[in-house]
Amino acid sequence: MHHGWILAGKAGLGKHDFALQAARELVSEEAVPQPIGEHPDIHMLTYGPKDDKAARAAAEGKDYERARSIRIGQIRAMQQRLNTRPSVGSRRVIIINPADDMERPASNALLKSLEEPPQGTFFLLVTHRASGLLPTIRSRCRILRFPDMDDETIARHLGAGSNAAIALAGGSLGAARKFMEMKLEPIAKVMQQLAAQGDPTLALRAQLISEIGARPSRERIQSILDLARTTLAQSIADAPADKRLGIIDAHAALVDLAAKAPTYNFDNGLLVGEIASLLANAGGASEPIHG
């Protein structure tokens, strides 16, 4: 079996759970007892503590603020582990999630391990945006793509009252669940109005900013960016020909914002204003706002 795999697809399709289950299968060996709980030969790299203060809180078992990216120190610590033998059997698995949020130095460091993987070591790179990985990393891994889910399947999981969530989930069960948990339907309705008719008076933009709230969490911002992109993607089919280029440009700008949001120190108020402006411009607004 190849040593490096990219698990690619939208957020909310079950890639993380699949990676954990696949890792269990990879490290299991006949006649070698396996631990029931956390496995010492399955290593998960994700967002670590933001700073020393957060690291102390994490060590004490307290809530802590996470970094916005996966850093080179985490990759180097993992590589130190690779210099030792696995604890239980002869194989180990490294899961990196989300791999597209590795800092550039971290990606370069990981590349060395992918080029010369230790015997019995497998890498599972979970990504919502495979294009965000270095081409050299992509070339050394095989890609397993997770397809979108159909509406009927999502509805079976979510039950009654989920139609609006399903319509804007873009085939992602996780996105539909977040839509319902975060009560995003009022936001979705304003976004659809902005994309359809613009906002020459700024009233809809003000309404959207009010619906989102003054201090949205990082997770809420990411869901709102996803929702804005889906809104534009769905609007282009019915848009007049003279508006389609504007929708495409606005969608590209939202994709760029979504890629930067986890690692850039954006002011949330300004970011929400920019999202509102991009939607309004796609709908034909004449004057953008930038906070």
Predicted regions mapped to residue ranges:
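Charged, glycine-rich active-site and insertion segments that engage polyanionic ligands
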Residues: 1-34, 119-122, 127-291
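Conserved Walker B
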Residues: 98-102, 114, 130
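Conserved adenine-binding aromatic site and its adjacent loop/helix in ATP-hydrolyzing domains
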Residues: 80, 112, 139
